[in-house]
């Protein structure tokens, strides 16, 4: 099974305008809202390719039903550690005349040390089902930059292949785990 990790799930709200004018009122021609996060997106594609997959990570309790309901609708099993707050919102403004997308992404609700510890503990059980682990995306405030390295090391002890898609300090620390 391919287990995907999403530590900072979100709602993408994509607004299409004919021509975006900064500092002015712009009228939306189309609005689309999607539940996502890099790991969730990977699992959705894998499911479409008829691959066995599972989502693992954090789930803000205010939007737990929305997130788990979305995954259940796609028949993707999930194992989440509940955190405070709601899904972060990423605003995407698409200027149709220029074919340009402008993004404004929230950081996410801070996660407690206890939630991080619980995630690392639950990883032991979740990894029993995994042959591949995909670590991808941003992390909310409160999650240490070495989280991907720590999870990679746990996975390696079980012979799980790890794919890392990260940037900045998450990538620098993550590659120390030798994914």
Give the positions of each predicted feature.
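Short, solvent-exposed amphipathic alpha-helical segments in soluble enzyme
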Residues: 19-22, 71-74, 149-151
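Cofactor-binding loop segments of dinucleotide-utilizing enzymes, especially the Rossmann-like FAD-
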Residues: 5-9, 58-61, 83, 96, ...
